[in-house]
Regions:
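Conserved beta-strand elements of the Class I
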Residues: 56-58, 80
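Alpha-helical cap/lid subdomain in secreted, periplasmic
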Residues: 72-78, 94-231
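A short beta-strand-loop structural module common to alpha/beta enzyme folds
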Residues: 78-91
């Protein structure tokens, strides 16, 4: 009997320790790697190209959406889109080598800057934004690629950064920097909606729901304008 009691006491004493042991966690799935400049976004597409494109359209969500909304425009003209939604000029500069220069196009069509004004990666002076644009232009020119600079669309609000207020003045200033630089260096500069009434400070709703991202009709106007340049 004494032996039974001792065994029971030993079992009871060890119970808290046994139940306190944490269950072995299941192996966690490794999250997909995402670099700051998102080099991985077009790595596969770049490796699968069988010939150099006539033009690389380089930019942010506007360019990203263009290739998705009207892919036939790109394939039929031997163009490729290398836009990434939300990107600033700093990020574009970092991936320029992989997504533009390495593809050896005849042209780089650059539309960028609105996300810098929106402070997507923090506050940045317009002069520094312009320096990024100039750096991209100078780098592609070293590789015999012709740059084409595009002006930012007018808008009185940035819906994902409403607290910043009306960005009109900054857009005008940056566009003036871009156009002045282009003129001084004999670079093609495109204002896609030059002939559209923008007296409201925005693109018409028939072309863009937020005056930043064009709809298909807006992209069709852009296509007719850029084809005048990419000869």
């Amino acid at each position: 009997m004494k032996r039974v009691v001792l065994i029971l006491m030993a079992v009871i004493a060890s119970a808290p320790f046994a139940f306190s042991q944490p269950a072995k966690p299941a192996a966690a799935e490794k999250p997909a790697m995402r670099t700051w400049a998102m080099h991985e976004r077009y790595a596969k597409a770049n490796s699968e190209l069988t010939k150099s494109p006539k033009a690389v359209f380089f930019g942010d969500s506007i360019t990203d959406g263009w290739a998705k909304r009207d892919p036939d425009f790109f394939t039929s003209n031997n163009f490729v889109g290398r836009g990434i939604s939300g990107q600033t000029t700093s990020q574009m500069l970092v991936r320029l080598q992989a997504d533009v220069i390495a593809l050896k196009p005849k042209y780089m069509v650059l539309l960028a800057g609105i996300n810098d004004i929106a402070q997507n990666n923090g506050q940045i002076e317009l002069e520094n934004v312009m320096q990024n644009i100039v750096s991209m232009v100078e780098l592609v020119k070293l590789h015999k690629i012709k740059p084409v600079l595009c002006l930012i669309f007018p808008t009185t609000k940035i819906k994902w950064r409403m607290a910043l207020g009306d960005p009109t003045d900054k857009i005008i200033r940056l566009n003036e920097m871009i156009s002045s630089y282009a003129k001084a260096h004999k670079i093609q500069c495109v204002e896609y909606f030059a002939d559209i009434d923008k007296s409201s400070g925005n693109l018409p709703e028939s072309l863009s729901g937020d005056s930043i991202h064009p709809n298909l009709d807006g992209y069709k106007i852009m296509e007719s304008e850029i084809l005048k340049v990419l000869k």
